[in-house]
From Swiss-Prot:
Enzyme class: hydrolase
Cellular localisation: Cytoplasm
Residues annotated for Na(+) binding in this entry: A166, C169, T172
EC number(s) given by UniProt: 3.4.25.2
Cellular compartments per GO CC: HslUV protease complex; proteasome core complex
UniProt record similarity statement: Belongs to the peptidase T1B family. HslV subfamily.
GO biological process: proteolysis involved in protein catabolic process
Name of this chain's protein: ATP-dependent protease subunit HslV
Source species: Brucella canis (strain ATCC 23365 / NCTC 10854 / RM-666)
Active site positions: T12
Length: 184
């Protein structure tokens, strides 16, 4: 668990759902500084690389942007190899003194694979095609898992999971951004 520092910008919820030939990453737009909402429409889910990878990040905002930039550099080194780029980033994350102190996590996906890159330098694949991170991640994960076996689409599941998380988590709002890709 990340220790809360009231002078650090925290909070968000990111969820990913892979179902029926689609992969979706959704995130909210709230940025909090301590117990104050600083911004309600931040964009924490975006396309990276050549537009064939989607990423969502949670944690300390500056740290998350640093990791996002590092992942983009790895994707330039290893184009169309998200798994390899992520593993190489994780190696750097574990060995670089500066990167080891970063307090952020990312969910990334391309047409083939969905991964979580954790603050400890781990690269994890989701079970059941669903994964969530951030302050409301457990709520979004539970909601998405409950809905994955229904006839709802990946995007519908992600949006519903995000709305449930936003109803419960004070660091998550209802300004939801969704990015999707066709999946194999």
């Amino acid at each position: 668990m990340i220790e809360h520092n009231p002078t650090t910008i925290y909070g968000t919820t990111i969820v990913t759902v892979r179902k029926d030939g689609k992969v979706v990453i959704a995130g909210d737009g709230q940025v909090s500084l301590g117990n104050t909402v600083m911004k309600g429409n931040a964009r924490k889910v975006r396309r990276i690389g050549k537009g064939n990878v989607i990423a969502g990040f949670a944690g300390a905002t500056a740290d998350a942007f640093t990791l996002l930039e590092r992942l983009e550099a790895k994707l330039e080194q290893y184009p169309d190899q998200l798994m390899r780029a992520s593993v190489e980033l994780a190696k750097d994350w574990r060995t670089d003194r500066y990167l080891r102190k970063l307090e952020a996590m990312m969910l990334v996906a391309d047409s083939k694979v969905t991964l979580a890159l954790t603050g400890t330098g781990d690269v994890l694949e989701p079970e059941q095609g669903v994964m969530a991170i951030g302050s409301g991640g457990n709520y979004a994960l539970a909601a998405a898992r409950a809905l994955i076996e229904t006839d709802k689409s990946a995007e519908e599941i992600a949006r519903k999971a995000m709305n449930i998380a936003a109803d419960i988590c004070i660091y998550t709002n209802h300004n939801i951004i969704v990015e999707s890709l066709d999946a194999q």
